[in-house]
Amino acid sequence: MPRLLIAASGTGGHLFPALAVADRMPETWSVRWLGVPDRLERQLVPSRYPLFTVRAGGLQGRGLRKLKQLIQLLWSAWPVTRLIRKQECAVVFTTGGYIAAPAILAARLCRRPVVLHESNAIPGQVTRLFGRFCSRVALGLPQAADYLSGCRPEVTGTPVREDFLKPAACPDWVPAGDGPLLLVIGGSQGAVGLNRMVRAAAPALLAMGCRIVHLSGHVDPDQGQLEHPAYSERPFSEEIPALLQHADLAISRAGAGSLSELAVCGTPAVLVPFPQAADDHQSANAAAAAAVGAAVIVAQHGPNEPGLRRMLWNLLGPRLRGCDPAADPLRLLRQGMERLAVRDADRLLSQLLQDLAAEA
C-alpha cells in the first residue's frame, strides 16, 4: 500500500485543504501526517491519521536571527528524513508554513517527489525560497505564478471541506423574513475594525428590511452593542457552509481559504482585506477575485467613513427597492464566483500526487 506524507501545521488555512486532499486519496493509499507540537493539528488529525511531530519555527526578523531560524529549519529536516524512510512514504505533500521547509528538504534527500500547495495570490516566504526544490508547486490562484521563478507551477485551486460542497438547510436561528440576508464573517484576526465598520452601516440596512448574521470572532470588545430582531450576532458558527449557501451577500476578509469557500458556494462578497497580512497578500487575493467579477473590495476604514455603507447600498439597494432582478448587481457577482470556483481541487491534487508517485 503506497503511503503519502502530509506536512501541514498551524492554522485552518494550512490544515483544512490538506485534510481535504487526505480524505480524497484512494482507499489503496495510506496517509501519515507531519505537524508541530501544540498546534491545531493535535486536535484535528489524530482521530483520522497517524500524527508525527517535529519542532519548526518561522522565518521572522533579519540578519543573524533569520539565519539562525533558517539553520534550525534545515536541522529539522533530519528527523523528517528518518520518518520518510521508516514509514516508506512514496510522495510528500505540504501546504506551506513552518513545517514545509524541512518536509521539502527531507523529500529531496530521500529522492521522493514533493508537491507544495500555495493558496495565496502572493506566495509566502517558504514558497518563494523552497518552491524550486519541489516536483510541482500547486497554486490556488494563477496570479501566484508571477512571483515564482525556477518552479513548476500548476493551477489546481484550493481544496475546501466537503461540507461546503453539499447542499444544507438554512439554520433555524437565522432571522426570518423576505429581506436579503447579509452574512458577516469577522475572522479570527483583525476582526475589530471590520466589525465596527459593519455595525456603523447596519442600522440603515436593517431599517430597509435587510437581515444580518454577524459572526464577529472571539475577540470583540463591542459585542452585544447592536440589537435588532433581524440582526443575529455570534462569535462563531459551525454552520458556515449553510450560511454561505443561503446568504445573498457576504462581507469577509480575503484569506485564500475564505475566498475558496465563498467561491464554491457561489456567494457574492464584499472583501475587506486584513491590512496587516504578510506581504499584503489579502489585497492581492481580493484583487484576483475582483478581476473575474466575483467580488468588490472595500479597504478597512473608520466606522464613521461611508465606504462600506455606500457599497452595501449599491449592492443591496436594488433588491431592497424591489427593482428588476435582471439589474441586480448580486446576480453578476454570483456569476463571477462561479467563474472563480474550483470544486474539484482535492481531486486534482490527489491525482497529481498519485501520478508523481507512479513516475518516481
Swiss-Prot record:
What is one Gene Ontology biological process annotated in the Swiss-Prot or TrEMBL record?
cell wall organization
One GO molecular function term of this record is:
UDP-N-acetyl-D-glucosamine:N-acetylmuramoyl-L-alanyl-D-glutamyl-meso-2,6-diaminopimelyl-D-alanyl-D-alanine-diphosphoundecaprenol 4-beta-N-acetylglucosaminlytransferase activity
User: What EC number is given for this enzyme?
Assistant: 2.4.1.227
- What keywords would UniProt list here? Cell cycle, Cell division, Cell inner membrane, Cell membrane, Cell shape, Cell wall biogenesis/degradation, Glycosyltransferase, Membrane, Peptidoglycan synthesis, Transferase
* Chief site of localization: membrane
Where in or outside the cell it occurs: the entry states: Cell inner membrane
Topology versus the membrane, per the UniProt entry? Peripheral membrane protein
Give the residues the record marks as binding UDP-N-acetyl-alpha-D-glucosamine: T11, G12, G13, N120, R161, S188, Q282
Q: Which reaction does it catalyse?
A: di-trans,octa-cis-undecaprenyl diphospho-N-acetyl-alpha-D-muramoyl-L-alanyl-D-glutamyl-meso-2,6-diaminopimeloyl-D-alanyl-D-alanine + UDP-N-acetyl-alpha-D-glucosamine = di-trans,octa-cis-undecaprenyl diphospho-[N-acetyl-alpha-D-glucosaminyl-(1->4)]-N-acetyl-alpha-D-muramoyl-L-alanyl-D-glutamyl-meso-2,6-diaminopimeloyl-D-alanyl-D-alanine + UDP + H(+)
A GO term from the CC aspect: plasma membrane
Give the metabolic or biological pathway.
Cell wall biogenesis; peptidoglycan biosynthesis
In UniProt terms, what function does this protein have? Answer: Cell wall formation. Catalyzes the transfer of a GlcNAc subunit on undecaprenyl-pyrophosphoryl-MurNAc-pentapeptide (lipid intermediate I) to form undecaprenyl-pyrophosphoryl-MurNAc-(pentapeptide)GlcNAc (lipid intermediate II).
UniProt lists the family membership as follows:
Belongs to the glycosyltransferase 28 family. MurG subfamily.
Show the HAMAP family listed in the entry.
Answer: MurG
Protein's name in the database:
UDP-N-acetylglucosamine--N-acetylmuramyl-(pentapeptide) pyrophosphoryl-undecaprenol N-acetylglucosamine transferase
